[in-house]
Amino acid sequence: MKILVTGGGTGGHIYPALSFVEHVKKEAPATEFLYVGTENGLESQIVPKAKIPFKTIKIQGFKRSLSPQNFKTIYLFLTSINKAKKIIREFQPDVVIGTGGYVSGAVVYAAHQLKIPTIIHEQNSIPGMTNKFLSRYVDKIAICFPDVASFFPKEKTILTGNPRGQEVVTVEKSAILSEFGLDPAKKTVVLFGGSRGALKINQAFEQAFPLFEEREYQVLYASGERYYQELQESLKFSEKKLTNISVQPYIDKMVEVMANTDLMVGRAGATSIAEFTALGLPAILIPSPYVTNDHQTKNAQSLVKVGAVEMIPDAELTGARLVAAIDDILLNNEKRQQMATASKGEGIPDASDRLYQVVKTLV
């Protein structure tokens, strides 16, 4: 079988695709893959490192306001469809899977015109513009949140979950916290604002720092590279020298860390949600206000409804509120266990299997 995968722009579109590819490689080693992205997108750095054949087309996104740039966008979209058709004819895939981003719009639409079976994978609780456009043309639509089904044709839509969820459940308990100077036997909260960090979360952590004194739990905080030096300088002048806190610029083995902690605090991106729910980890989510259609708030609300997470709006985040929310969960074993059970219930630990079954129905 030959599978062409396309998606890009953000890690939320790329990492689920890579998790799926790795799963299929184990299940059916003879399967051939080709990943189509853009030369300037994050995928151009990540996919080749994963040793997956990679080709590019040139495309850009629409401006949401009236802009002459949109004429160029339309031109690039039309020319990219022709380029995508050329790539598809050369590779001759049995199925094409789009995981989001403008590049998948051109490639999946081109595959539809060439009468090749197509699937789109929607990670969020509100669909992106590309997947809304493609939904009328594709054969199947794989979703991660039941709520998003209402945006798509019922007969095409299947709840598969996010392949990242299946990848993380294989991670075992370890003493990884000792690598950060923390005690693996103590309750621990991991706090982060995404790969680049988040200013509001950073400010709240700085306010919260002295409040963590004499807590029974530990705090592992990933500030993001761009805030790390500034934060270190600020904390240097703090009167408190706390041994139950570790501050890192970035945590490379985040999934392994989450598998060995008791609570996660961070943004409400689809990939993070797939990971911590698969692990059955309770969370405090601070949705980013800077994403399209405010989809992170919708992602978080779907989990608040079932009691798996608590949500703090970005505009309301302070150090005191952050510590109070962490205390309320980590110092209350019954509540933490109830949230963990609810989180596990929302996880889909066989997401790659489910998506692979959808592929096999089309081939």
UniProtKB/Swiss-Prot annotation:
Annotated positions binding UDP-N-acetyl-alpha-D-glucosamine = T10, G11, G12, N124, S195, I251, Q296
Protein name per its UniProtKB record = UDP-N-acetylglucosamine--N-acetylmuramyl-(pentapeptide) pyrophosphoryl-undecaprenol N-acetylglucosamine transferase
From which domain of life does this come? Bacteria
Q: NCBIfam families given for it?
A: murG
CDD domains (UniProt xref): GT28_MurG
Q: Which organism is it from?
A: Enterococcus faecalis (strain ATCC 700802 / V583)
Pathway, per record: Cell wall biogenesis; peptidoglycan biosynthesis
Q: What's in the GO CC field?
A: plasma membrane
Pfam families xrefs: Glyco_tran_28_C, Glyco_transf_28
Q: Which family does it belong to?
A: Belongs to the glycosyltransferase 28 family. MurG subfamily.
What does the protein in this record do? Cell wall formation. Catalyzes the transfer of a GlcNAc subunit on undecaprenyl-pyrophosphoryl-MurNAc-pentapeptide (lipid intermediate I) to form undecaprenyl-pyrophosphoryl-MurNAc-(pentapeptide)GlcNAc (lipid intermediate II).
Entry GO MF terms: undecaprenyldiphospho-muramoylpentapeptide beta-N-acetylglucosaminyltransferase activity
